[in-house]
A protein has these predicted regions:
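Residues that define the transmembrane beta-barrel architecture of outer-membrane proteins
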Residues: 34-38, 65-69, 76-78, 91-95, ...
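Extracellular/periplasmic loop regions
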Residues: 98, 107-184, 192-195
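Transmembrane beta-strands of outer-membrane beta-barrel pores
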Residues: 4-8, 56-60, 77, 86-90, ...
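Extracellular loop and loop/strand-boundary signature of outer-membrane beta-barrel proteins
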Residues: 25-28, 58-59, 69-70, 115, ...
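Outer-membrane beta-barrel translocator domains and adjoining extracellular loop/strand segments
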Residues: 13-19, 63-70, 95-97, 119-125, ...
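Outer membrane beta-barrel
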Residues: 1-51, 57
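Repeated loop/turn-to-beta-strand initiation elements of outer-membrane beta-barrel proteins
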Residues: 1, 49-52, 77-84, 105-109, ...
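Residues on the lipid-exposed face of transmembrane beta-strands in outer-membrane beta-barrel proteins
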Residues: 1, 40-44, 71-75, 97-101, ...
Length: 228
């Protein structure tokens, strides 16, 4: 595939350590539409359960020092999806691994990535999800951000500025709990909620939403946000 395209290398539900190619400007409000990244991409099946995905991502204005090569191998072993990811830049290297599976009625996942180069750090996410009341879903994820700081006073004086400017890290602390749930109350009504807890400074973010379709042309949406 040649041209602008969506590119996701992550597998965690909320924060994926290997999703580092950002096709939008972090300084502006995030929007539903994201234009994609300019890339040359090759995908090939290696059988019924395996494939390789590799390519080149163009940096700003095609600058070689800001461009990157990537490779990803995906397979399935005894019902568990496995993925190994490699990203190479002139100044950085990322090696990642992810596993997704199930235990009974619960979904399980784990993903980790090691960045080395001018800055070195680990990032990892592990989580579980499941269903309730026929139409409801819930999830719980723990995230470790090795690029962050445990001391609040150092949030804006981080030792890993490139993690935020190049690799799309946006959380400032190191340890987080993320949870969420959603439910379809009827064919036209749904609710959802998500919470993020910072275990280092005990701050938190909570959001909830309500959606109801009144007709093909009209709908009602309401949201609630809280930072503590």
């Amino acid at each position: 595939t040649l041209g602008r395209q969506a590119l996701s290398l992550g597998s965690a539900r909320t924060i994926s350590p290997t999703d580092v190619f950002l096709p939008f400007d972090l300084r502006v409000l995030d929007t539903e539409y994201r234009p994609g990244v300019d890339a040359i991409r090759f995908e090939r099946s290696l059988g019924d359960l395996s494939m390789i995905d590799a390519g080149w991502i163009a940096g700003a204005e095609g600058k070689p020092e800001e461009s990157a090569w990537f490779g990803r191998w995906i397979t399935n072993a005894r019902g568990v999806d496995l993925a190994a990811t490699w990203i190479e830049r002139p100044d950085y290297r990322l090696a990642g691994f992810a596993a997704n599976g199930a235990a009974g009625q619960f979904g399980l996942w784990w993903a980790a990535a090691r960045v080395s180069g001018r800055e070195s750090y680990w990032r990892s996410s592990i989580g579980i999800d499941g269903g309730f009341a026929a139409t409801g879903l819930w999830m719980l994820e723990l995230h470790y951000n090795g690029a962050g700081e445990q001391d609040v006073s150092r949030y804006l004086a981080t030792e890993h500025p490139d993690a935020y400017q190049i690799f799309g890290v946006f959380l400032l602390a190191r340890r987080y709990v993320l949870t969420g749930l959603s439910a379809q109350l009827s064919g036209v009504t749904s609710i959802a909620a998500q919470a993020i807890l910072n275990l280092d400074d005990r701050s938190s973010f909570f959001q909830a939403s309500f959606d109801r379709y009144l007709s093909d042309a009209w709908s009602v949406q309401a949201g609630y946000y809280r930072f503590d």
